[in-house]
Amino acid sequence: MSHSPARRPRPFVPAGWLVASIAVLLGGPAASAQGTMSLTTNTQLPAVGSQWNLTLSGAPGATFFLKASTAPSEFETAFGTVFIDPTVMFEVARGTLDPTGDFSVSFPIPNDPTLVGHVFYFQAASKAGAVKDSSNALAIRIGAGAPEGARHPSAIAATADGARVYVAHQEDGTVTILDPATSAIVRELPVSPIPTNIERELDVAVDPDGRHAFVVNPALPQMTVIHVATEAIAAQVPVPLSCRAVAFKFDLNGNRVFVASEKDQAVLVFTESPHGTFTQSATLPLRGLGPAKLALLPDGHLLVGLHNTLEMEVIDPDDLDGDPFVTSIPLGSRALDLALLGSRVFVPTFTPSTVIGPDGVNEVLEFDSTTWTLVDRHFGNLGTDYFAAAVSDANLVVCGTASGSVIVTEPTAFSFTSVVDMIPEESPKGLPSAVALVPPAGGGTPDRAWVVDRVRETIRAIVLTGGPPFTLEAEIPLAHSGAPRHPLLDLNTAERGGFLFDSVLFFNGSPTLPNPVSCATCHPANFSDSITSSRGFQAQPMFAVANTAPFAWQGGAPDLATFTSAAFARHGVVGGNLNKLAAADVTAFMASLTQAPTSPFKNSDGSLSDAAQRGELLFNGTAGCATCHAAPLFIPPSTDPPTLVNGVGTGLVPANVPTLLGIWATAPYLHDGSARTLLDMLDLNVTDEHGTTSGLDAGQKSDLVEFLKTL
């Protein structure tokens, strides 16, 4: 049956351009259609005031409907997968594909800067006779212009068949999808708003069936689900703020996705039913604090890396009614990653020194998960800041982020250990910060380690076949400029300082002779490391450090420049013009740190709960907290001496009063880490040397804690 040529396609300019509540997401050009239809665009980030074009290709003469939505929702049908949420969809165009099988429509985007960041999802459906078809899904985000600025790629995952690699960018809210067989970028897919909080880690993971990839961003109340086959955003699943890691358990009990929630101090369980729909079904409480890493053990238990209480905790995800706790494994340091090979668990970490002098040891701890005995310690200070690891039967690969190197070994007999300089052709080096082992197309033993460099904004493969010395393939630029970012030449002053903060460069370190520490060793991602050093003091967090002079626990540095110089001297960095320039850059970087991450304990509109409001009254009144921690920075008022003597059951010590901003994320507390929780901090104050809290009842203390968690 032919369609009347008089029925011309009718474009619609949707009123939704002006909807202020649209989720901020981004999409890229379509790589392939679900069936024979293909939906493409001239730009994934059209600017306000521009014309934006869509092209639909399919069967000549087919009747089609092009629809848009403000939310994705995966739903499988007989003729394809629909990603448009029918409750919020609207028609964009309809008609008949021309004899070439094409249809194009152009939208004028109003020149209204308030539209920047709004998102729309598009998908088309068609019918030619009895044959129905649906196109790929496409999302676009309205921007102010062409993408620019830093992206900071920081997480990586790969499908088990080696067909796709996913790289999540921390700063511009996108995921780059690559074909590792051709080293080609397939798509730039948006998953979160701009800007995101670059001080929190993202995570990306692919489920065991290879059907979906999941992205969590601690700064967002959503988990993005990517449909692997069509490379479309399948869903945005509501989660609390401050979710930090993803793991899976697909078995006879169903398909479950586990998410580490720092807000809940728990593991959240999401069940898939029906296909593509993920709904929270349970909450697994944790005894430890700061869940940041997850891994499924061979016995079906879940391993959780806890960054605040410096331990690992094993829980039973099938125990939904009782206490899921199985055991805990003290580490005394943070589990920077979890890499599993059967019952063997490899945990990269930094173990602080217990004596005055050396700072500590970068090492990979090996545990037997059947007994949780420590089997061995590997790679002592062969690199600096082992922020990521991956393991297969053939290779264990560990990123020495700060030293610009990657360690490769054979994980059974450790018959060789090779330190790979990731940028042998240039100096200074980059920051290799994430790694995935990827098999050849079709699956099998991984033959390449794909390494993401956070500062150069590149991905590069180490060819693992043949043994050492290992071959490096060419860098693939991920930066908006299309070229690797040189750590010194292509960054502004604060960005250079951020690189130096994370690097051993000015600590006279190199890939083959690293210094044991960088600034980021004790202040990773601007957080406290929760480690009490041999000097009896915890490393302070860098939240809002620009506005919280004086600095250091003793308050001896009146400004950031003095503080930086003292830190350099503490680590043996003295003299020379290069180090003077480095100190100035690091100072500029710290001066850019003016805020703490948004608290996940506030209401969605930023308001306080009733309990937190009661706690605020106590904070500013009866408890006397505001005497030393005055808003808005929660440090002593300018009329008071910056360094006060405070004893909280730990002996009187001269302690610079720290800001309380971000205190919800920096357990344990007090200068020596003796208070495990905020409530413990209040309970230790039996002589009221740290506010007047000894007379508060349990309910009042709970209210005060609820307020502190909102800062």
Regions found by a protein language model. Give the residues of each.
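Extracytoplasmic/periplasmic beta-strand context in beta-sandwich domains
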Residues: 136-138, 235, 282, 327, ...
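Residue-level hotspots within well-ordered secondary structure
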Residues: 34-146
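Predominantly soluble domains enriched in secretory-pathway, periplasmic, or organellar proteins
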Residues: 143-499, 504
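Bacterial Sec-dependent N-terminal signal peptides
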Residues: 27-35
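Periplasmic c-type cytochrome electron-transfer domains
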Residues: 150, 297, 334-341, 350-352, ...
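Bacterial N-terminal signal peptides
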Residues: 15-28
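N-terminal secretory signal peptides that target proteins for export/translocation
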Residues: 1-12
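Short basic coil micro-motifs at the edges of alpha-helical modules that engage polyanionic partners
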Residues: 112, 236, 283, 328, ...
